[in-house]
């Protein structure tokens, strides 16, 4: 949570400098490569923020149902926290890597001034690196993410086989969702089916030995992280009331959707190449072709930067209601 908050704060610091600094007789904020950096900062911060709110809110909601006078109250709290270990690890990895990206690109925007202690970026650049190491390195947290999903799937706490049976011939289930949100829903559900199938393939091939296959655990964890971002961010966007804030959020969500759709495909490809599953590679290609999905990520970034420049700071801290649930790969 603190790393995400730090990223939002540093966006404003880098933005203030970019507006003031001139090069070649114009503000560096007008250069497209600088705009690209800011669009990515905003999007990554919003994704991390969404995961944080979902995770902490779900834990808080579950704890609120416990009887504080019960002798087993604290044991119950511990059980709830353990039940959210996957979400917590995702939040830790995502938050620390979001801050790392924002600090690094913030220094790049500021140039040599980024190392001067008069600016907040210098201290952040010096201190940020530890976030990917303590509280469990991000590598250990990725092992937790993949390992816990594996464990829950084998114990059928996540009903992998049932869900796959329901999606054998149709990776995108029918829905009465509004037409304007149909494409978003379809992409999220495609990625859910993709993640379910990759999980199943790994369980069938390795079983519990998967925990020793770190070449696979890392891309598998990244696949799970990407799907968690897609699922949570769609629910956050969908829960918003119609209006100006939802329109601005939608512009960021479009970029999130495209980025993690392609990242999911890439991680799945890496896994399937390694385990030599050409049939699943072909199946993914067939199902993907049904989407006819043609995102325009540069246009999305241009829209995000326009909103950011108008606000002159991170501008997406508005919630209408909770969108709480476990991050799991089944409905």
What positions do the PLM features span?
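Alpha-helical interface subdomain recognition
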Residues: 1-331
């Amino acid at each position: 949570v603190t790393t995400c908050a730090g990223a939002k704060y540093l966006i404003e610091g880098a933005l203030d400098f970019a507006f003031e600094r001139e090069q070649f007789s114009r503000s560096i904020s007008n250069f497209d490569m600088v705009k690209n950096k800011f669009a990515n900062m905003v999007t990554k911060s919003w994704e991390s923020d969404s995961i944080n709110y979902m995770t902490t809110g779900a834990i808080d909601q579950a704890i609120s149902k416990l009887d504080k006078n019960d002798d087993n109250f604290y044991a119950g709290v511990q059980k709830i926290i353990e039940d959210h270990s996957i979400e917590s690890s995702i939040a830790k990895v995502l938050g620390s890597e979001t801050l790392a990206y924002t600090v690094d690109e913030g220094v790049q925007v500021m140039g040599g001034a980024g190392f001067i202690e008069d600016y907040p970026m210098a201290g952040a650049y010096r201190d940020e690196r530890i976030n990917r190491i303590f509280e469990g390195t991000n590598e250990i947290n990725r092992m937790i993410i993949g390992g816990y999903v594996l464990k829950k799937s084998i114990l059928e706490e996540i009903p992998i086989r049932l869900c796959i049976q329901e999606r054998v011939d149709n990776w995108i289930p029918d829905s009465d969702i509004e037409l304007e949100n149909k494409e978003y829903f379809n992409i999220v559900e495609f990625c859910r089916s993709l993640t379910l199938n990759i999980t199943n393939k790994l369980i069938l091939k390795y079983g519990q030995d998967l925990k020793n296959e770190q070449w696979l655990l890392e891309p598998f964890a990244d696949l799970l992280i990407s799907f968690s971002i897609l699922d949570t961010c769609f629910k956050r966007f969908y829960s918003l009331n119609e209006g100006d804030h939802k329109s601005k959020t939608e512009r960021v969500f479009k970029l999130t959707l495209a980025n993690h759709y392609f990242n999911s495909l890439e991680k799945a490809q890496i896994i399937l190449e390694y385990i030599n599953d050409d049939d699943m590679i072909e199946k993914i290609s067939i199902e993907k072709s049904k989407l006819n999905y043609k995102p325009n990520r540069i246009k999305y970034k241009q829209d995000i930067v326009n909103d950011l420049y108008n606000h002159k700071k991170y501008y997406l801290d508005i919630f209408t209601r909770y969108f709480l649930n476990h991050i799991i790969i089944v409905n």
